[in-house]
Design a protein with these regions (language model features):
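Active-site core segments that coordinate phosphate-bearing ligands/cofactors
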Residues: 1-2, 7-15, 20, 25-36, ...
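Extracytoplasmic/periplasmic/luminal assembly and interaction segments
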Residues: 61
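Glycine-rich, mobile lid/loop segments that gate access to catalytic sites or pores
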Residues: 57-58
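A conserved helix-loop-beta module that forms one wall/lid of the active-site cleft
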Residues: 43-54
Length: 176
């Protein structure tokens, strides 16, 4: 995935956050390891995969060559972070099952936190993914609506025509 690719090129370390490893559908969310069963069925050598790590794991200092090329201090550390919806939940202060976060962007996503592993059969039958959260033993699920960004664009184009025109005249975005 993109995260571990970037981390590897910046540090030489192959690691990936649990929440992003989950996006491969080949990650066992119970054991927090790659699923040998899936890799064997697909005839893929699991050793080619980056090591799954908790969100916030330090991959170490940036390689001197990378630091020089992109203008960062060679003392800069590279940290594996999470899927954007997990980051949104953390940023919104959602740390237990009493609340959820609703993020709108390319998609709209409601992200509730579960204080323990939810019933996987119920979740999977509803087409919800279950993802390890930043707090050990907690999980999140993603309830996606793929019209998120498209709906916002439709509203701007249809309901905010005048505002869009005024923003264009002012040389700014209607979203500012």
């Amino acid at each position: 995935l993109m995260e571990d690719y970037v981390v590897y090129h910046l540090t030489g370390v192959r690691q990936i956050d649990y929440s992003l490893a989950t996006r491969t559908m080949a990650f066992d969310i119970s054991s927090l390891t790659w699923s040998r069963e899936i890799f064997e069925a697909a005839e893929i050598d699991v050793s080619k995969m980056s090591a799954p790590v908790p969100t916030g794991t330090d991959a170490g200092k940036i390689l001197e060559s990378a630091a020089e090329e992109i203008g960062l201090s060679p003392d800069c550390h590279v940290i594996s972070v999470s899927h954007d919806q997990v980051a949104a939940a953390v940023g919104a202060g959602v740390f237990d099952s009493s609340v959820a976060v609703d993020g709108a962007g390319t998609v709209e996503c409601v992200t509730p936190v579960f204080d323990a592993m939810p019933d996987v059969d119920v979740m999977y039958n509803g087409y919800f993914s279950i993802v390890p959260y930043v707090i050990p033993g907690k999980y999140v699920a993603y309830a996606f609506s793929y019209t998120g960004g498209a709906l916002m664009q439709w509203c701007t184009d249809t309901l905010a025509k005048k505002e869009k025109e005024l923003a264009k005249e002012a040389g700014c975005s209607v979203n500012e």
